[in-house]
């Protein structure tokens, strides 16, 4: 998973999932100032099973390589504003399991472009099904979602809204003409 090491991101459930799946390697990328981590979360991290690695903060290229090398992306966050890391995982073609929360309604569809889960046991079942090949591969549909929600696609949608509202500013030349006369 990727995110701050806090309970809201689903860290306790992530660790419980690792306990239930001891033969699977779990990686968590992200960092939070230890002063901001509640004691119970800090203790859970200190007592994490051996199959869990906290990689901390990594550069963009290392994170991309981690996404591309993953067999499954399990994002157990309880609350999100958009789910950027989900889009990153989908763009990298990783089978993805997310918590079934309202922010994903309408664009992430269970069994169509991702798998959704509402409990640690449901996550275990979906992750196991993906690793064993028992669940259908949704990576191409997931990639399409990432493309549809790319910055370029979102910018074009915003431009269309402005155009329909007749508030699109007049186009400016790409390279404004410069005054050739110099003093």
Where are these regions (language model features)?
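A charged, aromatic-enriched C-terminal amphipathic alpha-helix characteristic of glycosyltransferases
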Residues: 136-163, 167
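Glycosyltransferase donor-sugar binding loop
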Residues: 2, 25-40, 54-56
């Amino acid at each position: 998973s990727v995110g701050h090491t806090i309970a809201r991101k689903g860290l306790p459930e992530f660790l419980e999932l690792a306990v239930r799946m001891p033969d699977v390697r779990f990686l968590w990328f992200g960092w939070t100032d230890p002063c901001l981590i509640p004691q119970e979360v800090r203790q859970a991290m200190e007592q994490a099973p051996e199959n869990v690695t906290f990689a901390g903060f990594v550069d963009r290229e290392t994170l991309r390589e981690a996404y591309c090398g993953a067999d499954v992306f399990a994002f157990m966050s309880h609350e999100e504003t958009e789910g950027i890391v989900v889009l990153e995982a989908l763009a990298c073609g990783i089978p993805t399991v997310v918590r079934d929360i309202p922010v994903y309604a309408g664009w992430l569809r269970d069994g169509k472009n991702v798998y959704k889960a509402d409990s640690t046991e449901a996550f275990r079942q979906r992750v196991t099904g993906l690793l064993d090949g028992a669940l259908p591969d949704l990576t191409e549909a997931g990639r399409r979602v990432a493309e549809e929600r790319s910055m370029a696609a979102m910018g074009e949608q915003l431009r269309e809204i402005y155009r329909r509202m007749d508030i699109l500013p007049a186009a400016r030349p790409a390279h404004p003409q410069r005054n050739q006369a110099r003093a």
